């Protein structure tokens, strides 16, 4: 007999909200960005999260012990690394070196997750209730969340709970498979989701102590569907409102539990009571989970030692002359390779790193489109609106008519009546189109439309404020070159549902060309320059800013020179295009060494047009460090396309407002990227989106493997694995900043969320000293420890001298 507890509505609502916030959001495919899969667990350390996720889904959060054993065997991880990692864990009765090394040599038996009622019913009946539930829920959710892929839109006006009830009362599949009277059960549920949750909780005998992990488990079992709903809540809260979709999904999942319990209570009652007792116990990591977390940290210490050695190597002498060309790129790790190659082409070239949205949080309408593209970090709201309408009204109207005709034709092809006849009648006509598409004939992937403009324009004072803020954040206030290129980045691929994930994360999953062109226009405005001069930023009259786009798939640079025609700069622009082309050749050759089946730089370009290519580029695979310092600290040093590089000169940042911006925005975005790759590598079945070869796009929002079921979020397996080995080492990001420790400590003290990332080791923080070396390690609780000068670093420096 189930014990009934007096559970209040407020308690249940609070628990449901906590469960919702334990789920990370996922953005739609059209504007997908990397998301930290551990977003709801950053207040806990790795071993604790291992225990929590193990309880609800047997989710690994580190590599298996054998992985670390191999690194110990080959000398990558030293005894000192293990000892320092163990000390950093701050765990009472921490395992000693011998115990840790013994544990690395044997497999760790992870405890089984607690069972849901669906799991218990499946064991008792032999019916795959979790699978049936996933199938029926996915069938409904793909229609409810559809963003235009379906021909008929599902009703959403009254929310997810009401929409599901309307569908479930007519879906006989659960009853056919053995859940007697399910449609009738759904029809008799309370009219509001809140009442239904409370009724189900009381029938199941839930109490306060077990709600935290049990409700989290139910949402977790819905996979990407819960993450889509969490995205709706995220977007609503950015607009200072709220959204009940994820709470509705929790209610639906809880009602499935209630229905199954009513049918199988006499057979699973005792087991369910034991499960409730287990859920009520504190979440405590096992010894093996603690040791795995220490081994993970030891590996990161080893990598940090090598990073310190690279940064400590001598840098080339800096010239005092005015730069011939300045090129600002996104901090994205893919820019590191190109920047290094470009600087090697000509010593007069200076490159800079800055967030790829270039400080302009734009809601943009592309040419002949009314769709609002949020080209900004997902942590922020739009601050300006822009459009690429252009002055040619006739051309825009023609483009709109063509787009409408294309949409109508597409719907005709997919309609129930016409689809089969269409294939029979017109299939041969498409042979020519297939050939043209395969050979890239007759299309212009580089048609970026007219120059974007702010609409409405900002007042002059606001323009000057924005320009000053951005230039100071870039540490670019003096020594301007005659030509300053602002290069956003994007990707150029075909037949790839994840194309937006290859674009700029700081631009919300869009390319960064619009933001770069908007900033160039702002900085070329004479009145803005006059205002900047009054504020101590004197831009020479012969300096021209140009927007550009760095295609990270082909490493081609497109300069938008027509945005700002200048005969005086024609020769300089032509020379810059030559330098960019030379740097692109060098970059492609280096990237080809990492890409499977790529023999040289020519193969890199071909991959972008190959329909069957599952790895057109590695995107941010391999990312391991974030460095905010003057460029000369890293110039001439190969970071192998694995470091985010943000220019920052703390001596120009008197109030440390730029430092605060870096630590609370770009660093957080980089952590989302790093931890998405981490999660998709250590737990690909949970935090990854599976095999690209099996993907089907559903609803325009995400992918499923096969023809339905759970929505898959995260990175595809092909994005972290090259077929024979890992393309990404799952390492938590090492953040290296050249700034006073006191200033960083003060920022951490005022930003609890950022501090939690460092205190709980989701990120590592290092302070660079006056010589640019990694000198201090942040150890948590606003404390720092001085780093010992590693012998290998000394040897490297002596050899270099």
Curated annotation (Swiss-Prot):
Stretch forming the signal peptide: none
One GO location term (cellular component): plasma membrane
Binding site for Zn(2+): 330, 332, 489, 504
Alphabetically ordered keywords of this record: Cell inner membrane, Cell membrane, Membrane, Metal-binding, Transport, Zinc
InterPro entries, alphabetized: DabA
Entry's family note: Belongs to the inorganic carbon transporter (TC 9.A.2) DabA family.
Name this polypeptide is given: Probable inorganic carbon transporter subunit DabA
Organism name: Jannaschia sp. (strain CCS1)
């Amino acid at each position: 007999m189930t014990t009934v507890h007096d559970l209040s509505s407020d308690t249940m609502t609070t628990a449901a909200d906590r469960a919702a916030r334990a789920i990370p959001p996922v953005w739609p495919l059209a504007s997908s960005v990397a998301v930290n899969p551990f977003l709801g667990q950053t207040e806990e350390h790795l071993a604790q999260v291992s225990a929590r996720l193990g309880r609800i889904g047997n989710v690994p959060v580190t590599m298996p012990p054998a992985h670390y054993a191999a690194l110990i065997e080959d000398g990558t991880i030293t005894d000192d690394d293990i000892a320092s990692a163990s000390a950093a864990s701050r765990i009472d009765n921490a395992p000693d070196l011998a115990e840790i090394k013994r544990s690395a040599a044997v497999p760790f038996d992870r405890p089984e997750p607690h069972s849901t009622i669906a799991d218990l019913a499946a064991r008792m009946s032999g019916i795959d209730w979790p699978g049936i539930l996933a199938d029926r829920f996915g069938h409904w959710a793909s229609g409810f969340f559809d963003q235009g892929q379906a021909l008929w839109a599902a009703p959403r006006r009254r929310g997810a709970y009401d929409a599901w009830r309307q569908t479930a009362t007519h879906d006989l599949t659960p009853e056919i498979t053995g859940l007697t009277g399910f449609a009738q059960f759904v029809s008799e549920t309370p009219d509001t989701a809140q009442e239904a949750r409370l009724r189900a909780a009381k029938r199941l005998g839930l109490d306060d102590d077990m709600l935290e992990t049990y409700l989290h488990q139910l949402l977790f079992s819905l996979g990407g569907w819960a993450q889509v709903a969490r995205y709706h809540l995220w977007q609503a809260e950015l607009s200072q409102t709220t959204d009940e979709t994820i709470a509705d999904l929790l209610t639906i999942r809880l009602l499935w539990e209630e229905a199954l319990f009513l049918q199988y209570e006499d057979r699973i009652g005792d087991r369910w009571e034991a499960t409730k007792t287990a859920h009520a116990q504190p979440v405590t990591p096992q010894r093996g989970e603690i040791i795995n977390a220490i081994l993970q940290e030891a590996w990161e210490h080893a990598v940090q030692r090598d990073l310190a050695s690279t940064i400590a190597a001598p840098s080339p002498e800096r010239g005092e002359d005015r730069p011939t060309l300045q090129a600002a790129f996104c901090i994205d790790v893919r820019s590191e390779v190109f920047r290094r190659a470009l600087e090697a082409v000509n010593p007069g070239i200076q490159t800079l790193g800055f967030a790829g949205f270039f400080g302009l949080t734009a809601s943009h309408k592309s040419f002949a489109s009314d769709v609002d593209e949020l080209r900004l970090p997902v942590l922020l709201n739009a601050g300006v609106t822009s459009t690429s309408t252009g002055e040619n009204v006739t051309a825009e109207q023609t483009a709109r008519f063509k787009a409408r005709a294309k949409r109508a034709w597409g719907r005709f092809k997919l309609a129930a009546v016409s689809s089969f006849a269409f294939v029979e009648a017109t299939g041969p006509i498409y042979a020519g189109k297939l050939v043209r598409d395969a050979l890239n004939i007759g299309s212009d992937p580089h048609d970026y439309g007219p120059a974007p403009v702010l609409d409405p324009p900002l007042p002059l004072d606001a323009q000057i404020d924005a320009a000053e803020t951005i230039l100071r954040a870039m540490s670019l206030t003096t020594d301007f070159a005659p030509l300053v290129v602002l290069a956003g980045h994007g990707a150029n691929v075909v037949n790839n549902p994840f194309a937006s994930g290859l674009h700029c994360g700081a631009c919300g999953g869009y390319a960064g060309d619009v933001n770069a062109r908007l900033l160039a226009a702002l900085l070329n405005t004479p009145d803005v320059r006059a205002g900047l001069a009054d504020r101590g930023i004197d831009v020479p009259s012969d300096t021209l800013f140009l927007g550009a786009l760095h295609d990270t798939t082909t490493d081609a640079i497109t300069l938008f020179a027509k945005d700002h025609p200048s005969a005086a700069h024609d020769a300089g622009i032509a020379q810059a295009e030559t330098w960019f082309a030379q740097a692109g050749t060098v970059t492609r050759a280096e990237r080809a060494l990492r890409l499977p089946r790529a023999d040289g730089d020519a193969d890199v370009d071909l991959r972008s047009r190959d329909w069957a290519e599952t790895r057109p580029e590695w995107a941010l695979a391999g990312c391991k460090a974030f460095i905010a310092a003057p460029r000369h600290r890293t110039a001439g040093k190969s970071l192998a396309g694995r470091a985010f590089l943000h220019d920052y000169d703390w001596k120009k940042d008197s109030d440390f407002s730029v430092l605060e911006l870096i630590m609370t925005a770009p660093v957080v975005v980089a952590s989302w990227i790093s931890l998405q790759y981490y999660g998709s590598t250590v737990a690909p079945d949970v935090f990854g989106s599976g095999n690209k070869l099996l993907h089907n796009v559903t609803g325009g929002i995400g992918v499923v493997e096969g023809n339905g079921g759970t929505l898959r979020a995260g990175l595809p397996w092909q994005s972290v694995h090259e077929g024979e080995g890992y393309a990404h080492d799952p390492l938590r990001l090492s953040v290296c900043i050249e700034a006073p420790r006191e200033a960083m400590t003060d920022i951490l003290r005022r930003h609890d969320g950022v501090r939690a990332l460092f205190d709980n080791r989701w990120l590592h923080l290092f302070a660079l000293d006056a010589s640019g070396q990694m000198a201090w390690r942040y150890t948590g609780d606003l404390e720092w420890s001085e780093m010992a000068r590693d012998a290998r670093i000394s040897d490297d420096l002596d050899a270099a001298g």
